[in-house]
Structure formats: C-alpha cells, structure tokens
Amino acid sequence: LIVLEGAIELEITREKLPLIVKGFLAALIILIGNIYVLQFLFKALFGMEGAPAVLFAIPLAIISSAVAIPSASSLLQLEREFVVYESTFSDILGIMIFNYALRQLESQQPLLGAEPMVSLGLQIIGVIVISLLITYVLFRMMQQIDHKVKFFLILALLILVYAFGKVLHLPALVTIFIFGIFLSNVKSLLPPFLRKTLDLEATEKELHEFHILTAESTFLVRTFFFLFFGFSIQLSDFTSTSPVLYGLLIFLAMFALRYVYFTATSLKLKPSPLVYMSPRGLISILLFLQLNEVAFINLEESPVDERLLLIVILSSMLVMLLGTMKKDQKKEIEIQDEEAPLSVEMDIEPQSLTEKDNKNL
C-alpha cells in the first residue's frame, strides 16, 4: 500500500524529467552513502560488521515520504515537487535494497557481484512487462465491473500479484511500483495500441476514487503501526543515556552527509530547506521490526534497538520542523515587505510659503 500510494503520487512528464532525475539521484546517492556511513559507525561503536550491520543500516537510512510530503506544503513549488520525488524514491529504493540484501544474505550469497546484479536487472525488465499487462487488465476490469464494490477487488488482486512474486522470488514491490506509475500516467506511458482499446476519459473519475481509497487505507495502516510501535516503547527503558547519545550521533552523521550532498550539488554553503526534509518514519519501523524474523539477528541483544530507532525518528522530525518554521518566517517577512505601503514624507514649513502661495491655497 505504501509503495503503491507513493508511485501514484509521481507525475511523469517530459517537462518534469530533469526534476525527477535529480530526485532519483539524490535519493539513491544519499541512501547508499548513509548505509556505508552507518556501517562504519556500527563497527566503530558496537563492533558490529558484516550482514547485521547492513540490515540495521538500511531502515535508518530511508526517508519517510509519509511524513516528508505533507510537511513540504510550505516550500516553493519546485522544492515541494523535489521532496515528493526524492522521498518517494527513497522509500521504494530502500525497501527494494532491503529485500534484495535480505534475500542475498539469507542464501549466503555476496551482495555485490555480476551474477546477482544481472539476475536482478533481468527480473526488473520482466516485472515491467508484467506490470504493463496488469495495468491493462485492471483498466479493463474498471470499465467492465458495474458493481459498487470494485476497488477493494483490485487491491486484492494486487496483493495476490505481490504474493505470487514473493513465492517466485521476484522483486514483487517493483511490480506494485511500476503498476502505480502506469496507473497515474496511463496517457503518457501506456503504448498507443493498448490505449486505443481503453476509454481513458471514462476511467479518470474512478482512478481518482481509487487514489483516495489507497491514500486512506495507507493512512490507516500507518496510524496503527505507529500506535503499536509506541506501545512497544517503555519509558523505563531509557534509564541509560547511551541509546540517546548513540541515536543523536547516528542522526547527525546522516544529516552531515545530506548537507554535504546539497552543498556540493548546489554550490552554495547556505543550507537549502531541502536539507532539513529527511524525516524517518513508518518504513524505518516496518523494516526494523522485520529483522525479528531474520535467523542470524537477535534484536533483544543488539545495541541497535527500538530506543535508538526512536531517537533517530524524533531527531529527524524535530530538525524538519525547525527547518520548515525557519522557512515560514522568511516567507512572512518577504510578504510583509511586499505589502508595505509606499509612503513619501515631505517636510513643508509654513513660514517658507510666500504670500502668493497663501492666496492660492
């Protein structure tokens, strides 16, 4: 649901292609950079290395689009669109890298290598073709089904496709992602010979309703997971200051890397508001809790636990809040300057007026 909602949010046009590429590169480079930095920190602080360090680093490195996109409403239009693309790509790439790393490590295969990378590339190409066909079939279903209840049926079919992908060891999330991309950009991405057989104008309203249903379902899932995560945290667990200090150090390292990236790409030392837009959230929690099922990881004895994750999440959200507040204050000052009335003060002394001027007055 989270990947599907993020993909539906992406509007792909020729005019926005440079911005999309920038958002994708920022998400990929910062994500990979954070994983390497966190691996180094985990080894230096906790003596952790190898597979556990990689799997613990990935959830902490992912930006939460669920938090970043609504928080970017006060930014300029280009900055807001960049946040949408970067955070969505960070979510999707992070989940894909996590599942890929988990599959490789559980099968005791190397993370990087020619064979696994070629295999992954071929799988993604196959998934794109499958997603194209699924999009066409679901559009036909939207037009053929007259019953009121049809959107949950479509979601059920997508869940079925995801389950088949997991069973066949395919990147199933890529299927959902590509489907969402095709769904929201069907007029520009669907081949002409398939578009001719579909009444796209008639399905626009239904697509909008499907988007709303997906967004509300995702919001419900997010809410419950945040509640469950909150229930799992006990204040008595924070008797030691070590998790707080380690969490702050990890967040500052990731924030410094983000600052360096945006400084290098914009050639400006003054931090952009985009630097602050890197909150952690639901995806980090979900992937972190998934580590409970990994055989070679023991979360109860690990120094990287829920307390450290909570500190990183709260720190990232607090920095984002301060960054957006600073942006709002600048905007308010600029608006006040623009709306200030133009006034000209003239000092005229009555004594300087001549008799002729007095008569005219």
Locate the predicted segments by residue.
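Membrane-interface junctions of multi-pass transporters
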Residues: 1-22, 142-146, 158, 162-246, ...
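Structural signature of hydrophobic alpha-helical transmembrane segments
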Residues: 1-3, 49-64, 119-130, 171-184, ...
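Alpha-helical transmembrane bundle and helix-membrane interface signal
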Residues: 12-16, 69-128, 141-148, 189-195
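Transmembrane alpha-helices that form the ion-translocation and gating core
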Residues: 16-76, 136-137, 235-334
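Cytoplasmic-side transmembrane-helix entry/capping segments in multi-pass membrane proteins
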Residues: 17-32, 78-89, 146-157, 215-221, ...
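Hydrophobic alpha-helical transmembrane segments in multi-pass integral membrane proteins
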Residues: 35-41, 91-106, 160-174, 222-235, ...
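Hydrophobic transmembrane alpha-helical segments of multi-pass transport and channel proteins
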Residues: 92, 124-133, 160-170, 186, ...
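Intrinsically disordered, low-complexity non-transmembrane regions of multi-pass membrane transporters
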Residues: 187-216, 329-361
